[in-house]
A protein has these predicted regions:
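Conserved catalytic cores of very large enzyme subunits
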Residues: 1-125, 142, 146-214
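Contiguous, well-ordered alpha-helical segments that form the cores/surfaces of helical PPI scaffolds
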Residues: 129-142, 162
Length: 214
């Protein structure tokens, strides 16, 4: 079943803009500093610096269902993700355009000079870097025994998502790097995460009893 994009909703969320995603689901942010010569927002040619995913199921299982512990562990894991994202960003700093002329010199992503670094493209919203998340459903099953779609549980799930978004905004304000929240597609990671969860916590019905997480 393909993913469908609502142009109507996207216009509401993206300042009236409708545009395609990068790959399967990563959408660039609308940036006031990144506009085309005609004044329209720039999307084509921008890029993402990478993703680090937080395993929310692990956070819930590590807390053993204690909400105070959950929020403490979540904060620790978010800081760990931040450090990992910084590693990705810093690995790109100093890269010269010559390593991929089609990307950096001939217009696929930019038109830099030979020998010029890509550093300026890593700031001011030209590129994004993503905090991915996985396991909202299983996280809620561990904490409440119910799905995130349950009216009782939905506020908790939304509070977690808001915290992820707030942390990205905090990091961005401090560093001028466009951190964003991203629903990680998972692909092979879903199996790896599930096996790690089973090894650490055993089989918990509705939480770790599958070879994938949502």
């Amino acid at each position: 079943v393909p993913d469908y994009i609502s142009a109507k909703i996207m216009r509401q969320l993206k300042n009236g803009n409708v545009y395609t995603c990068m790959g399967c689901r990563s959408f660039l942010t609308v940036e006031e500093k990144q506009k085309n010569p005609d004044g329209s927002y720039k999307f084509y040619g921008r890029f993402n610096q990478g993703v680090v995913t937080i395993n929310l199921v692990d956070v819930a299982c590590s807390s053993e269902g204690d909400f105070d512990k959950f929020w403490e562990i979540l904060e620790d894991r978010l800081e760990l993700c931040h450090r990992a994202l910084r590693c990705r960003h810093e690995r790109l700093l100093g890269t010269v355009s010559d390593v991929a002329p089609i990307l950096w010199q001939y217009g696929a992503l930019a038109r830099l000079k030979k020998g010029e670094t890509i550093d300026k493209l890593l700031y001011d919203g030209y590129s994004t870097i993503s905090l991915g998340y996985a396991g909202i459903y299983e996280m809620c099953m561990r904490m409440y025994g119910k799905s995130h779609t349950d009216p009782e549980v939905r506020p908790f799930a939304m509070k977690v998502m808001q915290r992820l978004n707030d942390k990205c905004a905090e990091w961005r304000a401090a560093e001028n790097i466009s951190y964003s929240v991203y629903g990680t597609p998972m692909e092979s990671t879903t199996y790896r995460f599930s096996k790690c969860l089973q090894k650490r916590f055993g089989i918990i019905p509705g939480v770790t009893d599958k070879n994938y997480i949502t």
